[in-house]
């Protein structure tokens, strides 16, 4: 056994001079320090961990009295010494507390430094694990809807997968006391605090906030605000795993491909600027219709605490893995009538002109073959009645063309002319 005193001077000191370069090379080779996305990582407990803190902790194991200045010197040298990035392991290999599970072939192996993984679920993988309480809770949360239940399981499994292949974000909706926070609490406890962050939708794109998602399995935003999101560009990139730039205070900016999954809960989903529908295509809106109140039979105010047990977590792991296998096999999530309805309703809320179209349909008002002035005037009345900001007439006509495939055409009415919305090819 090497003691710090015995090798300190002959190996890492020349007289009183600290040989920071030799010590850095020693650490690199013996503590398995690499770069991922230009960020230094060190191998610890089966995975590679980012951050200078763990690297400095490894230093003082060898030289306990190494001061901060010398530790910083070593870190700076490591940053220069290690120039190339190491590619992380494929997403199909998932780390649990007791080993690595391969979602493709179902194999389970031990940890080695050769497997470059940066996240570990802090619970054991136990085939066949079951928890009756968790099973019943998920059924109750889903209101015994099998499609919703499968989606809840798939959302868990999708968090295990370090790749945003499907480009989807989950939003759980509904009033209070319906199980949203209980479900998210289970997911948070399952993934572990070190694997999650908690940004609101409106915070995405803030200068230093995006960096918080680097290396996380999930961003879990409970009870997000309903403020209008005017610039969702960063959100779209993060959901699809496109490369984004991030920055930590006092450090150089860096780029990364996000694999963190989004799970938000909201009483009311914020409106998002989405002219092309690109944001809406990324959303999976799951309605939570249950009612867990004090006057209901079986109400348990301690349910969140009870659902933190190892039995619950190991059962959720099995459900999540089964859900992930379904996702990969089907190349998508389980279809749900409730989810489709919720998404259609949000589309109407998010793009008020769709609500106007629906009102026209309900009241048998035909946009086609009506004058643009009359239709726009009716649209303004609709906005006024619903406390909405009306878009300009030009923008309104663009929306008519995009959604209803109508263009404008000048026609004569008696001695006057007027512009009408018409179908067919534009002349």
Residue ranges of each PLM-predicted region?
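Loop/turn-to-beta-strand initiation segments
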Residues: 215-218, 258-262
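Intein modules and their embedded homing endonuclease domains
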Residues: 2-123, 391
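Replication-associated primase and helicase/ATPase modules
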Residues: 1-29, 123-140, 355, 412-427
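A short, contiguous, amphipathic alpha-helix enriched in charged residues
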Residues: 17-20, 143, 188-193, 228-244, ...
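Positively charged interface segments
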Residues: 68, 72, 82-83, 87-90, ...
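Conserved AAA+/SF3 P-loop NTPase catalytic/coupling segment centered on the Walker-B
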Residues: 217-241, 254, 272-279
């Amino acid at each position: 056994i090497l003691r710090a005193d015995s090798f300190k001077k002959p190996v890492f000191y020349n007289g009183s001079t600290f040989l920071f370069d030799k010590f850095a090379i020693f650490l690199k080779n013996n503590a398995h320090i690499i770069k991922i996305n230009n960020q230094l990582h060190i191998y610890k407990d089966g995975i590679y961990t980012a951050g200078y803190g763990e690297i400095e902790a490894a230093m003082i194991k060898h030289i306990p009295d190494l001061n901060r200045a010398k530790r910083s010197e070593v870190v700076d040298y490591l940053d220069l010494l290690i120039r190339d990035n190491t590619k992380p392991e494929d997403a199909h290999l998932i780390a649990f507390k007791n080993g690595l599970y391969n979602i493709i072939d179902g194999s389970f192996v031990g940890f080695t430094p050769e497997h470059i993984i940066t996240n570990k679920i802090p619970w054991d993988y136990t085939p066949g694990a079951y928890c009756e309480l968790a099973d019943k809770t998920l059924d109750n949360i889903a209101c015994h809807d099998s499609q919703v239940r499968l989606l809840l399981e798939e959302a868990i499994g999708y968090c295990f997968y370090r790749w945003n292949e499907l480009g989807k974000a989950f939003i759980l909706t509904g009033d209070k006391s319906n199980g949203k926070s209980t479900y998210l609490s289970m997911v948070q406890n399952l993934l572990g605090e070190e694997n999650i962050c908690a940004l609101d939708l409106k915070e995405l794109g803030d200068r230093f906030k995006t960096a918080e998602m680097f290396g996380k399995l999930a961003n879990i935003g409970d009870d997000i605000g309903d403020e209008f999101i005017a610039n969702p560009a960063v959100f779209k990139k993060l959901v699809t795993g496109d490369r984004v730039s991030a920055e930590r205070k006092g450090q150089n900016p860096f780029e990364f491909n996000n694999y963190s999954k989004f799970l938000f809960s909201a009483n009311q989903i914020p409106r998002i600027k989405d002219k092309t529908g690109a944001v809406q295509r990324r959303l999976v809106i799951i309605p939570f219709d249950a009612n867990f109140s004090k006057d209901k039979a079986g109400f348990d105010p301690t349910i969140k605490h009870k659902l933190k047990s190892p039995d619950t977590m190991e059962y959720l792991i099995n459900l999540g893995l089964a859900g992930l296998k379904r996702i990969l096999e089907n190349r998508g999530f389980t279809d749900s009538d409730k989810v489709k309805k919720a998404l259609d309703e949000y589309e109407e809320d998010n793009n008020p002109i769709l609500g106007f179209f629906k009102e026209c349909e309900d009241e048998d008002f035909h946009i086609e073959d009506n004058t643009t002035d009359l239709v726009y005037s009716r649209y303004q009345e609709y906005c006024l009645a619903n406390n909405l900001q009306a878009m300009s007439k030009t923008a309104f006509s663009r929306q008519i063309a995009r959604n209803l495939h109508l263009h404008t055409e000048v026609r004569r009415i008696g001695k006057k002319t007027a512009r009408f919305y018409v179908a067919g090819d534009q002349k």
